[in-house]
Amino acid sequence: MDKDTELSRDDFLPNVLTACEYDGKLAILPQTFSLQTVIGKAEDVGTTPGWTVEDMKALLASKPEGTQLFWGMDRMSALTALMNLGYNDFINWENASCNFDSQEFIDVLDFANMFPEEFEYRDDMEDSTVLMSQGKQLLDTYYLSDFEQVQMYRAIFGGPTTFIGYPTSEGNGAMLSLNNIIGISNSCKDVDGAWQFLRTFYLPKKSSDGDSDYTYGFSIRKDDFEKYCQNAMKADSDSGSTWGWGEFEVEIQPATQEDVDQVKDLVYNTTAVSGAVSDDITNIINEEAAAYFSGQKSAEDVAEIIQSRMQVYLSETK
């Protein structure tokens, strides 16, 4: 790309390029992306994205008994949610070291253990949208790819919402979900020829409303993304149409400037990538945590075992 006369890094969202780099080089490039985050009522979680496990625990503790964070969450899914971005808090990737035997990680295990061992679905259970509207469910996982969903959640929660994100000590708690990823193999015999083909997917469109030509998500081209945001504030064929979810129906209106600013702030400040952590790492944690959740071992013992296994893994894969 750096040698291309028509395309430059300035044409693309800088945070997406950063997320696609490995060892300082652009390794892959998606065509579109969405954002994976957690949404909640601003009255509950505040207006600034980003919080910690302690913040999440404090919110739940402040609510009446029976209030739940997410719908249908059991111990393992709670641990997954807590650790979606939490790995960076316990692993030093550069030094291949970790601190899973810390009190902070033990607290994560203890918090996850507060959830039921298994989620038992019943036909008479209230819909998630009803629980959120009544304040009985505080959060929901959110895959952001358009502005219509923003309006839907605002109606469900009955007020302004915040993309609070998954708990982490740094950042906004959101992750990029990359779509239609392509790249050039190290073994490619004609890199220039391969690029001449791949570049066609990223050239500026002669006529575009900024909406993606692909299946899902926002375009990674900066001009297309900005155009899409501007057009979202204009009345179009979707304006006045009705979106339904559970017990709720919302008449879709043009996005407000506040909606656009909120989404753009999240997009431009997210560099973490969903699925970037090896399955080997998540398997180590889940396998050992199961012994604590079943009462076979203490949280402290499990944390020590995870620390030992993880350190060996990091050393071997450094």
Tell what function each PLM region has.
Residues 1-37, 162-167:
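Hinge/lid segment of periplasmic solute-binding proteins
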Residues 2-11, 88-108, 168-173, 295:
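Short, solvent-exposed loop/beta-turn-alpha elements that line the ligand-binding surface or hinge
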Residues 25-36, 55-106, 134-142:
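Extracytoplasmic/periplasmic solute-binding protein
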Residues 36-40, 182-183:
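Short glycine- and hydrophobic/aromatic-rich loop-to-beta-strand nucleating segment
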Residues 43-51, 187-194:
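Short helix-loop capping/hinge motifs at secondary-structure junctions, enriched
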Residues 58-64, 113-117, 125-151, 287, ...:
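Short helices/loops that flank or line small-molecule/ion binding pockets
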Residues 94-126, 151, 161-166:
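Glycine-centered hinge/linker elements that transmit conformational signals in sensory
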Residues 151-152, 171-176, 183-283:
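C-terminal lobe and pocket-closing loops
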